[in-house]
Structure formats: structure tokens, C-alpha cells
């Protein structure tokens, strides 16, 4: 059995689906899952009581609304939303996010 890790191509993985707001698991490590997602339009206001949430923008622009303002993320930027903090991600055009 080969134990050499194989690189994961984000482009190839994104080519496998077109659905919006439907994260796809592309890798797992310990207790973590790495998910790719296509985002366009507005999501609902929500929070995560048990875990932080990370957004890494690979392509496009992602806006994340908070109760006291909005953060704009461009390709190559990352944001960690602390657990329990209400937020709403949105994108006026498709953004590809890890």
C-alpha cells in the first residue's frame, strides 16, 4: 500500500459540483474536515455554539455581516469567526471558499 500523500486539486474538485451553499468534504485531518463550497447570494444569520468557523476565499469576494459591521474578504484572504458570534455570509457573484 502506497503511503505517499496525493495533492488535492481545488480546481478539479470544484469542477465536480455546481450547487451553491452545499459544502463538499475534500479532506479530513484528525477531527477536522476541509470543505470546498461555492457561495452566491445571501445565507441566513446564524452562529455556531460549539466551534469557530473559518472562511478562506480562493476565488471571488465574500462579505460576512456581523451585528456591528461587515468584513470583506478577497481571494487569498482568511477570516476566523469565533464560536457563538452571529454572522451572515453573502456574495453578489460566485465566490469559491475553503
What residue spans do the PLM features occupy?
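A short, N-terminal "cap"/entry segment at the start of jelly-roll beta-barrel domains
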Residues: 1-35
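Conserved short histidine dyad/triad with adjacent acidic residue
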Residues: 19-20, 33-49
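A cytosolic small-molecule/anion-sensing beta-strand core signal
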Residues: 30, 58-59, 74-75, 93
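Short, charged/polar surface micro-motifs in flexible loops or helix N-caps
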Residues: 31-33, 40-42, 61-63, 70
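Short, conserved beta-strand element in jelly-roll/cupin
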Residues: 38-40, 48-65
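Short acidic-glycine-tyrosine-enriched beta hairpin
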Residues: 67-83
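Ligand-binding loop in jelly-roll beta-barrel domains
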Residues: 83-98
